[in-house]
Amino acid sequence: MKLRILVACEESQAVTKQFRALGHEAYSCDILPESGGHPEWHLQQDVTKLLEQQWDLIIAFPPCTYLTVTGNRWFNVEKYGDKALKRIEDRKDAINFFMLFANANADHVAIENPVGIMSTEWRKPNQIINPFQFGDPFEKKTCLWLKGLPELTATNIVEPAPRKFFESGKSMPAWYAECWHLPSDERSKMRSKTFLGIAEAMAKQWSEHIIKTKTNGH
């Protein structure tokens, strides 16, 4: 059974390619051009109209810039004035965009984001995963909000690389620290890209679940 799948906010095509490898009709969508090498699978447009179509599965990676807890200090109006007010408006827009996927008319939906404000603005995620549970030795706490889908089962738990510590006493995951030398736009892409092990697990486990569900008529 071939499934029709929309992977929203994914210029890397990391997840899209894994579903394609299993024979499914998967499309990445982003306002940016694809960087995964398959423009024929990429819908470079606003995702809103696409959500009106029929999809067997929607996976969304909405931008986290204004949703993550790490940026909370920039919302201090007394300290940052108009810049903070602008970020507050941008955060409202980001929440509304996230909720487009939460309210999408599809039986099977997954939304991915780092730990952030959506846990209180909407609801807590169904699951929090890390790449090191799926064969990639990296730490990147990732939240999944699921509709009609099972939680991902770890496929290969490995030891994550040691965190990078700084003179200030602060630390960050090794992969994240390695991104700092990149230009801001490239750094953003690297930080948001889905690790291979997680992409493979999403494609295999969720497609199998949906096919089983459709076959059994539930």
Specify the residue positions occupied by each region the protein language model found.
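Conserved active-site and SAM-binding loop architecture
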Residues: 1-218
